[in-house]
Design a protein with these regions (language model features):
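Secondary-structure boundary elements
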Residues: 2-54
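Surface-exposed loop/turn and secondary-structure junction residues enriched for glycine/proline
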Residues: 19, 42, 58-59, 135-137
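General structural signal for secondary-structure boundaries
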Residues: 21, 50, 119, 134-136, ...
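Conserved active-site-adjacent core of cysteine acyl-enzyme catalytic domains
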Residues: 46-60, 64-71, 93
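Hydrophobic/aromatic-rich core segments of domains that either
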Residues: 64-139
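Low-complexity, Gly/Ser/Thr/Pro-rich intrinsically disordered linker/tail segments
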Residues: 124-177
Length: 177
């Protein structure tokens, strides 16, 4: 198993476009994990809670996604940590959840690849960046009861801010019909 996981990591590392750029490397790790993996959480099967489940088998629960991200970030030399708490879907339901904290450019951010990996109604994958480099304030609407030694207050490396693809304001009256 270890050799197979090592081969998967090495093959991915060969595809990195700019290994010296932390943000670009983090983005490519994010995309690789969500493109490679689909969410699967059967009770009692620990393989789905591992980086092997996510990167080799292509199926994992949140713990497997997070451990795969951690493994690839570690190998890229990017400081990061696993974090556990509770996530809620906005409808009052949720449960125990794991995601990552990552240090990009000297600031810490929340990174949740599991929540960025939705499946569309037709079964296709949609690539999203809603949970890519969030501050504590930004993530607190859906993630809570987490404790860690890092303060995530910057938004400079958030995907939408960094790429300039965000709304500063919105008005229904300005919608084009």
């Amino acid at each position: 198993m270890r050799e197979r996981l090592e081969r998967e990591c090495e093959a991915f590392e060969q595809t990195l476009t700019d290994p010296g750029n932390q943000w670009r490397t983090e983005l490519e790790i994010h995309d690789h994990v969500i493109d490679r993996c689909e969410y699967h959480d059967p009770e009692g099967d620990l393989i789905y809670s591992s980086s092997y489940g996510a990167l080799v088998n292509g199926r994992a629960a949140c713990e497997g996604y997070s451990k795969a991200v951690k493994l690839l970030l570690d190998r890229a030399g990017i400081e990061n940590a696993l974090i556990s708490g509770v996530s809620e879907n906005g409808e009052g339901s949720g449960g125990a959840h794991m995601w990552n904290i990552v240090n990009i450019g000297g600031d810490y951010y929340h990174l949740d690849c599991t929540w960025d990996d939705p499946v569309s109604d037709d079964g296709g994958k949609l690539r999203m960046y809603t949970y890519f480099n969030l501050s504590d304030e930004m993530i607190s609407g859906t993630h809570r009861d987490f404790s860690y030694d890092f303060v995530c207050k910057s938004t400079a490396e958030n995907y939408y801010i960094k790429t300039g693809t965000y709304f500063e304001s919105y008005s229904r009256s300005s919608e084009t019909r």
